[in-house]
């Protein structure tokens, strides 16, 4: 596998990571990914909520959480109540409902700022991958493993890949901003 292919693969993982980070940012709509960071004290062991309960979206602004083990409904409710989501869980038997409140303009702007920060983190990671790959290319040229023309051509390819990936991150950010600001 060439250096450029390795860089492309690492950058693709960075884009996926950025998408995952974006999915955890609240918008006006309910999204099961909002609960990804929440852990439940499941028989004494911290366990991700999606491993102990099914999460559904019955209405655009409501999440329903149904524990697989009915005896753990209290622990799941407690984990949701102690989370930083800013919503109060309503328990109805074994089903726990979370109603997402409308976001204020101020909160929307905070979330846009957060999204911009996560996008910038992704771009920094891409630039670091580019830098490391360029260093490896320069070393290969210096050590005589490839000619200067080959090194220059690969560097241009690397720059094209880097540009396309940063453009993709920008497009993801723009899409997320629209989603957040949508009332």
Swiss-Prot record:
Q: List the Pfam families.
A: RRF
Q: Give the matching InterPro entries.
A: Ribosome_recyc_fac (IPR002661), Ribosome_recyc_fac_dom (IPR023584), RRF_sf (IPR036191)
- Family matches, as SUPFAM superfamilies: Ribosome recycling factor, RRF
Which HAMAP family does this UniProt record tie to the protein? RRF
Q: Which GO terms describe its cellular component?
A: cytoplasm
The molecule here is called Ribosome-recycling factor
Keywords in alphabetical order: Cytoplasm, Protein biosynthesis
A single GO molecular function term of this UniProt record? ribosomal large subunit binding
Q: Which PANTHER family match?
A: MITOCHONDRIAL RIBOSOME RECYCLING FACTOR PSEUDO 1, RIBOSOME RECYCLING FACTOR
Question: Which superkingdom heads the taxonomic lineage of this protein's source?
Answer: Bacteria
Into which family does the record put it? Belongs to the RRF family.
The protein's location, in the record's own words, is: Cytoplasm
According to its UniProt entry, the protein's GO biological process terms are: translational termination
Q: Which residues form a coiled coil?
A: none
What function does the entry list?
Responsible for the release of ribosomes from messenger RNA at the termination of protein biosynthesis. May increase the efficiency of translation by recycling ribosomes from one round of translation to another.
């Amino acid at each position: 596998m060439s250096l450029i292919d390795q860089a492309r693969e690492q950058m693709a993982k960075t884009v996926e990571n950025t998408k995952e980070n974006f999915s955890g940012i609240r918008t006006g709509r309910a999204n099961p990914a909002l609960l990804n960071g929440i852990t439940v004290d499941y028989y004494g062991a911290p366990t991700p909520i999606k491993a102990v309960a099914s999460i559904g979206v019955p209405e655009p602004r409501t999440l329903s959480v149904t524990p697989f083990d009915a005896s753990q409904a209290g622990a799941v409710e407690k984990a949701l109540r102690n989370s930083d989501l800013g919503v109060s869980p309503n328990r109805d038997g074994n089903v726990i409902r979370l109603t997402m409140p409308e976001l204020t303009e101020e909160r929307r702007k905070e979330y846009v700022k957060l999204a911009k920060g996560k996008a910038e983190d992704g771009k920094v990671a891409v630039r670091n991958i580019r830098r490391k790959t360029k260093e490896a290319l320069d070393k290969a040229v210096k050590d005589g493993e490839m000619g200067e023309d080959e090194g220059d051509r690969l560097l241009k390819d690397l720059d094209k890949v880097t540009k396309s990936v940063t453009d993709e991150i920008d497009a993801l950010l723009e899409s997320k901003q629209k989603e957040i600001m949508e009332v």
